[in-house]
Amino acid sequence: MSRYDLVERLNGTFRQIEQHLAALTDNLQQHSLLIARIFSLPQVTKEAEHAPLDTIEVTQHLGKEAEALALRHYRHLFIQQQSENRSSKAAVRLPGVLCYQVDNATQLDLENQIQRINQLKTTFEQMVTVESGLPSAARFEWVHRHLPGLITLNAYRTLTLINNPATIRFGWANKHIIKNLSRDEVLSQLKKSLASPRSVPPWTREQWQFKLEREYQDIAALPQQARLKIKRPVKVQPIARIWYKGQQKQVQHACPTPIIALINTDNGAGVPDIGGLENYDADNIQHRFKPQAQPLRLIIPRLHLYVAD
């Protein structure tokens, strides 16, 4: 497929996402809102976009005010729709839930509508990340040449739909991206970097090359069977825990965007019990279960690369 055809499909798919999101928000407003509970988080400024989040103050919104915030959030796709001071790199998150009363027919209609939106979002992401054939660093410029100001993460994010929950509880998740590597795999990566000299601020090209050589020597000095692990922290994420009484099971969802809960009164479902979201405080985290951590020694800080002792 030619690059021109891909751009045509990219623009066409995005227009469909916008149209279907507009239709969905109109459709939802035609349904009876049983309960809405949304939690807005502080705006991340451009100056603080890389700063660690040690505390997050939550503001609760209820009823029609919460619904209006959520429906606007679903269609928040461009930086032009937000304050100039807000970071365009830090993801805008709005945890919470909207609960609508449905019958069998309207439930199926909304399920199909949301499924179609999520299919389009997945297709759009596939075009950008795979079909474009571009490395991650070049994708930003390519996408924004054709869709100026697009917040790609908001375009990728699918909508979470649940049916007839009994209880909904919100919380925070601290996670790490973990990847196990062999010594030879790390050496191969460093060798590629050494073969393509460049400057990385605040280092000059020569300083960066020297830094890479030191890192290569440190890894090469390890035993061949050394166990290496990338353990990169991810910013704390809001989550929702859903309990289904009939199935006697709990399901956990990431909750960067308000969940849509359909309550089918034809089947005798009732309004769920919805909890709040507490302020986040990194110094006051309570772990339900924290397994014994494997002893690790940091060996390349910039890569978050550790070696198991």
From Swiss-Prot:
Subcellular location: Cytoplasm
Key words, A-Z: Cytoplasm, DNA replication, DNA-binding
Pfam family of the protein (one): Ter
GO molecular function: DNA binding
Assigned GO CC terms: cytoplasm
Biological processes annotated in GO: DNA replication termination
Function, as annotated: Trans-acting protein required for termination of DNA replication. Binds to DNA replication terminator sequences (terA to terF) to prevent the passage of replication forks. The termination efficiency will be affected by the affinity of this protein for the terminator sequence.
Annotated family: Belongs to the Tus family.
Protein's recorded name: DNA replication terminus site-binding protein
